[in-house]
């Protein structure tokens, strides 16, 4: 499989050089730049890794599965080989796994079981701009391990929108920035009706968008309940040529 070219690809040599000389890195890259999948793969053969694992932390289970699947396909393998993932109630890793994509609670349990993280050479914190307790705790614990037990442990904080300069100062880490992909965007507003339920408004908006534009739609909703209601309504009102998928978790 020919490796895809991402905006982050041009920055990979600098990432490797920085991590050869430093144990920490702050990497800024917009959505779609390829940081989630291309950076872990690029680090696989780094001499300082010494055969240890790379842990990639994702804030959501869907993202963890998707990232692992994409990287495994790039290597021409199935998930659970060189690349695997671990999330709550689901484990797709093996003795051969070198890149583990995990949700943040998994890292906390790993530290409880192995405080020195002896089998881990690098931890990558993806989407760190989505600040929440689990991610902050994971970074704090990893910094503690690095400072007291494992000065060879590499920590990479990756973000799309967080103030990278401020974070780099806090971590005393080099900072790299990648270009992203640009697409033309047109903003329009759909008239809302105050007396109409959310799912009905979304249904009307989707029907209008499908009638006026080719391609796919991505609809953002507040929670799982709203997603289920909108999905049911769209499946009733749209013909069989439109597939309605619920994405959450």
What are these regions, as identified by a protein language model?
Residues 1-249:
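P-loop NTPase motor module signature
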């Amino acid at each position: 499989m020919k490796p895809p070219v991402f905006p982050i690809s041009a920055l990979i040599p600098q990432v490797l050089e920085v991590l050869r000389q430093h144990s920490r890195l702050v990497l800024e890259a917009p959505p779609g730049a390829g940081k989630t999948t291309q950076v872990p793969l690029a680090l696989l053969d780094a001499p300082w890794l010494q055969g240890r694992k790379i842990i990639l932390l994702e804030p959501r289970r869907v993202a963890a599965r998707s990232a692992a699947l994409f990287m495994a396909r790039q290597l021409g393998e199935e998930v659970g080989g060189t690349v695997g993932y671990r999330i709550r109630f689901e484990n797709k890793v093996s003795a051969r796994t070198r890149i583990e994509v995990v949700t943040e609670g998994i890292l906390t349990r790993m530290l409880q079981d192995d405080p020195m993280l002896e089998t881990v050479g690098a931890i990558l914190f993806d989407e760190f701009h989505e600040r929440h307790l689990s991610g902050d705790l994971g970074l704090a614990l990893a910094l503690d391990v690095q400072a007291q037990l494992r000065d060879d442990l590499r920590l990479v904080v990756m973000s799309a929108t967080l103030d990278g300069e401020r974070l780099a100062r806090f971590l005393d880490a080099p900072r790299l920035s990648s270009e992203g992909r640009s697409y033309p965007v047109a903003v329009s507003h759909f008239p809302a009706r105050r007396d109409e339920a959310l799912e009905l408004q979304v249904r009307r908006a989707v029907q209008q968008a499908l009638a006026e534009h080719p391609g796919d739609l991505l609809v953002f909703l507040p929670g799982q309940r709203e997603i289920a209601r909108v999905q049911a309504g769209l499946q009733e009102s749209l013909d069989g040529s439109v597939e309605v998928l619920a994405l959450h978790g």
